[in-house]
């Protein structure tokens, strides 16, 4: 069985290296764990030190998150790409392409991204078996379907144009760098 995990750099700083060692003790080998800070600020040296940290814990860094997370438009680090707004979109795309090239040069084989405006809607957490805190979604508690984000009303055609623009810029760089993209 293939078991992996994912962790943001901020969360890694909270849980520390002990958590990484526990993952290895549980038999987890492949992880998606980001370095601390904005992906736009990561350097080759930061990524190399991060890989060493992961390997020291007995793990393999399989992928990192591009600065297009599932956080939603108000928290995502690349709003220009999601909103299709120039000149921010070009600057953000240049940064992502540079990041992918660095990943490839270090042998990090994959990068993941999310391309959405809403993020992942959730309602308040609930308790589950053994007192576990559960991420929860209750449709009857979600905001009106008519409410909008700062993106305003976005048609399917507009969203597909933005996705296509992103992919046309990023996929050739990923292919040349031998980095797989995961969405």
Locations of the language-model features?
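Charged/polar interaction segments and conserved charged motifs
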Residues: 1-27, 160-161, 166
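Acidic-and-aromatic substrate-binding clefts and catalytic sites of carbohydrate-active enzymes
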Residues: 5-18, 34-47, 90, 118-121
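Hydrophobic faces of well-ordered beta-strands that scaffold small-molecule active sites
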Residues: 1-7, 29-33, 61-66, 111-113, ...
């Amino acid at each position: 069985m293939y078991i992996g995990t994912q962790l943001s750099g901020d969360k890694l700083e909270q849980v520390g290296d002990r958590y990484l060692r526990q993952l290895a003790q549980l038999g987890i080998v492949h992880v998606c764990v980001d370095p601390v800070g904005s992906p736009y600020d990561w350097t080759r040296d930061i990524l190399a030190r991060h890989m060493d940290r992961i390997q020291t814990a007995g793990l393999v860094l399989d992928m990192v998150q591009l600065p297009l997370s599932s956080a939603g438009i108000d928290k995502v680090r690349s709003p220009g790409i999601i909103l299709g707004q120039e000149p921010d979109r070009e600057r953000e795309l240049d940064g992502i392409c540079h990041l992918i090239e660095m990943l490839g040069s270090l042998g990090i084989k994959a990068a993941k991204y999310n391309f959405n405006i809403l993020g992942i809607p959730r309602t308040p957490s609930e308790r589950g078996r053994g007192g576990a805190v559960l991420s929860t979604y209750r449709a009857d508690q979600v905001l009106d379907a008519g409410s909008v984000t700062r993106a305003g009303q976005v048609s399917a055609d507009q969203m597909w144009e933005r996705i296509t623009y992103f992919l046309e810029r990023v996929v050739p760089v990923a292919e040349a760098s031998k980095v797989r993209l995961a969405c």
